[in-house]
Amino acid sequence: GLIGSPVATYAAAPVAVAKTVVADEYDPHPQYQYGYDVQDGLTGDSKSQIESRSGDVVQGSYSLVDPDGTRRTVEYTADPINGFNAVVHREPLVAKAVVAAHAPVVHAAPVAKIAHF
């Protein structure tokens, strides 16, 4: 008997694959702009944002109503020289409650005692 059986081997020849390399388009002066505005009277959601880019400079602003009823507006710019800079404005939307004068104290009328026979 045979102790080891012969093993057939096969080596495939390398296949040449042509790859097409497509360079990503590079825009040396990219530009965009967008914005949105949400005013939902049912939920009270109130927010907006606008932003634009021209080359390496991005500028914009966003606005929202904080839980304390103050509108916060942030205006910002960003560029490679100055980095990101923002200015925050806060504007009260709800007038402060006026302290009411004390109402007169009302006393309960005395309870009449009824005699039962």
Curated annotation (Swiss-Prot):
GO molecular function: structural constituent of cuticle
InterPro entries with a match to the protein in the record: CHIT_BIND_RR_consensus, Insect_cuticle, Insect_Cuticle_Struc_Prot
Key word Magnesium present: no
Pfam families in UniProt: Chitin_bind_4 (PF00379)
Keyword Transport appears in the UniProt entry: no
GO CC term (a single one): extracellular space
Keywords: Cuticle, Repeat
Sequence repeats: 12-15, 108-111
Top-level lineage group: Eukaryota
Ranges for domain Chitin-binding type R&R: 29-95
Domain remarks: The tetrapeptide (A-A-P-[AV]) repeats found throughout the protein are also present in many proteins constituting the protective envelope of other species.
Function in brief: Component of the cuticle of the larva of Tenebrio molitor.
Protein name: Larval cuticle protein A2B
